[in-house]
Amino acid sequence: MLRVPDVKASLVEGAARLSTGERVFHVLTSPAVAAMVGVSNPEVPMPLLFEKFGTPDSSTLPLYAARHPELSLLRIMLSPHPYALRSHLCVGEETASLGVYLHSKPVVRGHEFEDTQILPECRLAITSDQSYTNFKIIDLPAGCRRVPIHAANKRVVIDEAANRIKVFDPESPLPRHPITPRAGQTRSILKHNIAQVCERDIVSLNTDNEAASMFYMIGLRRPRLGESPVCDFNTVTIMERANNSITFLPKLKLNRLQHLFLKHVLLRSMGLENIVSCFSSLYGAELAPAKTHEREFFGALLERLKRRVEDAVFCLNTIEDFPFREPIRQPPDCSKVLIEAMEKYFMMCSPKDRQSAAWLGAGVVELICDGNPLSEVLGFLAKYMPIQKECTGNLLKIYALLTV
């Protein structure tokens, strides 16, 4: 926690308002969140999220609401616990005695787990512009415990809990002095830590070779709970079932985990939130170098997946903006899972007729996933509605389609 040394500071819409009129707030780096709030820059001021969802609280933002399905998408992008519905995004705290405190990085708070920092990179910034368009990043030194600001009214707080008491016993023996090296004896200037900190060894997927090796390893076996980190195992397992509804490559003999991995490698290549690091912790220790033809095939799969997702979003934009004069009264002859996925997708968008858009969208997405050329699908749509050639928010829609 970082203390705001201003006696007249207050929390307003996710930011600390100072006595000088300036505001201190968090700026998170996420292209998907930027697309959600309508910002062209990937750096998103946190108060814009509070303003978009109109929360009455000035320090916390609920991550679930029945009337705001976009909050669920925001929870998936930010929270390390994406399936904890009763959770809140917390930027800081304000008390009458201690004043205003800001988290160094916003945390997700819930009854089922301890406070956990959000996933995207985040920094503190300050501005006097209430629209948050022009701001300056605050550089925090290592170990800093307060926000370095120039306020007219500062608050001094004495932390009594930091006091230490040491009692000396006159009967106790004198402490032994450490053995000092002899004069002239050389000593190493290297510093060695006595305590060995055990950290999880995560293999980062920085090359196509590693990603291709991971893809084929996932095809050979499923992760085992006793041999895997529990948090990453649960994340991958739950997302395989709940956020993997659309199979964009149905004619290939791939398991569901391989489909999920391909989607998140594509998300990573686009700079969007993904769980590739979770796959890395589950399979990274067993990677073997991929062969040349395996890397080429894996790259071709990614290109095919990207093309089909972009084609699907292009067609769904046309369906979204079309005012159906007569509603579609019969669902398409496709899987129920795909229809439900389209219903969830159009809950995040705002079509003119949600049910008709979901039913028609399911049929169109199935045609694209089966490998039909985009020209043929557009020729079919053009018989019933004008083709929408330009639309905004495509990055967010691609993320929604890959994680629905």
Swiss-Prot record:
SS bonds (residue pairs): none
Listed Pfam families: Herpes_BTRF1
InterPro entries in the cross-refs: Herpes_BTRF1 (IPR006772)
General function of this protein: Plays a role in the expression of late genes.
Subunit structure: Interacts with ORF34.
Entry's family note: Belongs to the lymphocryptovirus BTRF1 family.
Protein name as catalogued: Protein ORF23
Protein encoded by which gene: ORF23
